[in-house]
């Protein structure tokens, strides 16, 4: 079970959200240059923490509330080439004691997607996908609390969630530094956004990434972004 990458394997059995293209894109795209301490916020199976460990030398903290996902994290971290560099905290990130006193130069987060709508019948998946447990305002409060002054938080969101997320950013004095619209196929409307956030006002250029071309093959940009991770690239 799970998904094998070039440098590590992720067992995501029982996790609320399995390995996804969204998470791989985020983990490969985030600018970790100069990162001194990295947080994987809502780690799930630990994929983002593992990708960060492959890409930089910084110590990495992963926090996950779901016990099944946290168990998968432990196994995945232990089996990876970097077991001594990734620390797992099994706790609710909104609990003041969970990350007390910790500050990070980079925060990675693939947050819950749905502001409204029915919850899944599976509690783990519902928790992973629904913002009822970690809304955008709570997420942005965590970013302001635990991000260093010059730090960056990188996230992936559905396009339709952008307005609600921007409202939370503005409320807490955060701004977008980089914004990439992601389309599944060249020429199609974007479905996801890759965002880099920091303190201050918005300051970014419009960028676009297509995952596949019209023939169904990965685009050159997608291949360049993920070639260090996907086995067949």
From Swiss-Prot:
<keyword id="KW-0819">tRNA processing</keyword>
<dbReference type="GO" id="GO:0008033">
    <property type="term" value="P:tRNA processing"/>
</dbReference>
<comment type="function">
    <text>Specifically methylates the adenine in position 37 of tRNA(1)(Val) (anticodon cmo5UAC).</text>
</comment>
<keyword id="KW-0963">Cytoplasm</keyword>
<dbReference type="Pfam" id="PF05175">
    <property type="entry name" value="MTS"/>
</dbReference>
<dbReference type="InterPro" id="IPR002052">
    <property type="entry name" value="DNA_methylase_N6_adenine_CS"/>
</dbReference>
<dbReference type="InterPro" id="IPR029063">
    <property type="entry name" value="SAM-dependent_MTases_sf"/>
</dbReference>
<dbReference type="GO" id="GO:0005737">
    <property type="term" value="C:cytoplasm"/>
</dbReference>
<dbReference type="GO" id="GO:0032259">
    <property type="term" value="P:methylation"/>
</dbReference>
<comment type="similarity">
    <text>Belongs to the methyltransferase superfamily. tRNA (adenine-N(6)-)-methyltransferase family.</text>
</comment>
<dbReference type="InterPro" id="IPR022882">
    <property type="entry name" value="tRNA_adenine-N6_MeTrfase"/>
</dbReference>
<dbReference type="InterPro" id="IPR007848">
    <property type="entry name" value="Small_mtfrase_dom"/>
</dbReference>
<keyword id="KW-0489">Methyltransferase</keyword>
<keyword id="KW-0949">S-adenosyl-L-methionine</keyword>
<dbReference type="GO" id="GO:0016430">
    <property type="term" value="F:tRNA (adenine-N6)-methyltransferase activity"/>
</dbReference>
<dbReference type="InterPro" id="IPR050210">
    <property type="entry name" value="tRNA_Adenine-N(6)_MTase"/>
</dbReference>
<dbReference type="GO" id="GO:0003676">
    <property type="term" value="F:nucleic acid binding"/>
</dbReference>
<keyword id="KW-0808">Transferase</keyword>
<protein>
    <recommendedName>
        <fullName>tRNA1(Val) (adenine(37)-N6)-methyltransferase</fullName>
        <ecNumber>2.1.1.223</ecNumber>
    </recommendedName>
</protein>
